[in-house]
Amino acid sequence: MLAVLLISGIAHGMAQEVLTLEKALEIAFQNSPSLIQSKISLERSQMNLKAQEASLKSQFSLSVNPFNYSRQNSYDDYNSQWYINQNMSSSASLGITQPIKWTDGTVSLVNDFSWQDASNKTSGKTNTTFRHNLSLRLNQPIFTYNQTKMQLKELEYALENAQLSYALKQLNIEKSVTDQFYSVYQRQKDLSIAKDEYQNQKQNYDIIKNKVEAGLVAKEELYQAEVNLASSESSVYSQEISYENVKDNFKLLLGISLDEDIAVIPNTDIVPVEVNPIEAVKHALDQRMELRQQEITLEQDQFSIIRAKATNEFKGSISANVGMNAFDSNVKNVYDKPTDNEQIGISLSIPIFDWGARKARVKSAELAHESNQISFDEEKKQIILDVRSICRNLPTLLSQI
């Protein structure tokens, strides 16, 4: 059995890649599936924010209807005869819309131009019209929250949260790789010790066997040596299995082929650094990214409360429209007698009774905020406990190294 393991180890050693901790971390950062997914999520958040910021710039639109034709037969009951109406038209509309981030309103400049030719085949009458309409329009919500600014702020928080998640994922990968790197090294040393022990037991067995054959010791000692040798061989087999299992898990974490054989070389030259527990706790509370993520969640809860309060709320909008309307049967005379158009209006939405739906939604959002606040406080306590525990264990860990 041991011979098979040794031959297998030699075969693997021919194509073995030796990894340092730095090289293992570099491979993990490049190949880790979870880190790649986190980076994709970060890029998505960046694109969402970029799209929202682009939507706040002037939007240009062009609508063209090159040609439209219709023919309709109509019956006049009074004159008891049929009329054939024929209509041809063409139109184009150019619009420029500018959102107003500070007020959540929009300003639009719309330029419409159309041509229409209508004829009655029965009477022989024809009417041709060229029309140009230029208007400036304003739409402004009132008595409600600014949805545009809130959406932009939410996307900024989402991007910051994605950046924090990516950084945390990197730290988790670094910790996991470091832990498993030294686990592989530990199993590697355990296997080496087990093989050395096997060689010692084999030599001891050969010595006792020679002594038994020479009649210098009793046969019982040979039996005990055989038991010790078999136990040592079994230990080598167990350590070999444990070593291969740990290596497979490590290769899976690094994102490399499971068929590739590896070995690790750690750096055991550790420079001790004195840690002040009080300063360590203070630094952790200031820098831990998990706490910032919790703070972002609390800010997003405030947005949820605002939206809940806006359900069935009293709100309104102001709309205004000024422009010029010009038309004529001859395109050259369209602007001879233009007319001015002005329009302004206020609309209000007044809720009367909603059976308590708005109140329940607000209460639900407030309870969610309260729950997340408790989670935030508990996270701070847990961080303090973890840092204190690590500081207490540092002398023990240093002695183990």
Task: Describe the role of every protein-language-model region.
Residues 37-52, 169, 173-194, 210, ...:
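Amphipathic alpha-helical coiled-coil segments
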Residues 1-19:
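Bacterial Sec-dependent N-terminal signal peptides
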Residues 153-159, 163-283, 393, 397-400:
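Periplasmic alpha-helical coiled-coil/stalk elements that build and connect Gram-negative outer-membrane
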